[in-house]
């Protein structure tokens, strides 16, 4: 077990024989689950985990196929991710979580909630995928960075997505490149 950041614990479990990594922080009866977007990982939420963990037990999985979770050759359909969340919640003992999803994670959260309405306390969507009919420059840059992970493509993608105008931390760029170079990460 590794400490990823102050007060954030890294854990692993198995779903259908696949290793799933997740981060956990806080000690509350109220649970908040954060779902990352396409090509991202749990690290995408590191800056807000300490804030949320003051009020919630925060659980942040690397979705199956992403981050440091296994990347099986599978058909990554909405139903596949719904099944993943069902098993993840069951194995971690999570009941009636607050659920926040960003990008692809938002689409997964919305799909899950629509079929499990009585099992989610609150749903918050942050720029959910599936609502746009065309691409954007930021999405195009992100796809290029995922396909050709190097310092320049990653920095370009993250700079286009950074709304505050602040410089993207080097550990975000380095971590992204490392995860995109893992086997089956594309």
Regions found by a protein language model. Give the residues of each.
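Alpha/beta-hydrolase fold catalytic core
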Residues: 1-32, 54-56, 94-95, 159-163
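Active-site loop/oxyanion-hole signature of alpha/beta-hydrolase fold enzymes
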Residues: 15, 23, 60-101
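Conserved alpha/beta-hydrolase "nucleophile elbow" surrounding the catalytic nucleophile
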Residues: 36-38, 97, 101-106
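Conserved catalytic-core motifs of eukaryotic protein kinase domains, centered on the activation segment
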Residues: 44-46, 69-75, 134-137
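Flexible "cap/lid" loop of the alpha/beta hydrolase fold
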Residues: 107-115, 120-150
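Conserved alpha/beta-hydrolase catalytic His-Asp/Glu region
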Residues: 133-138, 147-186
């Amino acid at each position: 077990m590794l400490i990823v950041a102050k007060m954030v614990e890294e854990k692993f479990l198995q779903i259908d024989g696949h290793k799933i990594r997740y981060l956990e922080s806080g000690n509350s009866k109220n649970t908040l689950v954060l779902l990352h977007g396409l090509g991202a990982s749990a690290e995408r939420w590191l800056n807000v985990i300490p804030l949320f963990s003051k009020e919630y037990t925060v659980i942040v999985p690397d979705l199956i196929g992403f981050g440091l979770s296994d990347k099986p050759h599978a058909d990554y359909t909405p139903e596949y991710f719904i099944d993943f969340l069902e098993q993840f919640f069951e194995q971690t003992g999570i009941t009636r979580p607050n659920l926040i999803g960003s990008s692809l994670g938002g689409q997964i959260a919305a799909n899950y909630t629509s079929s499990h309405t009585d099992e989610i306390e609150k749903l918050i969507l942050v720029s959910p995928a599936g609502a746009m009919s065309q691409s954007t420059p930021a999405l195009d840059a992100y796809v290029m960075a995922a396909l050709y992970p190097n310092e320049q493509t990653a920095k370009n993608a993250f700079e286009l997505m950074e709304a505050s105008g602040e410089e993207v931390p080097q550990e975000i760029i380095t971590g992204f490149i490392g995860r995109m170079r893992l086997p089956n990460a594309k």
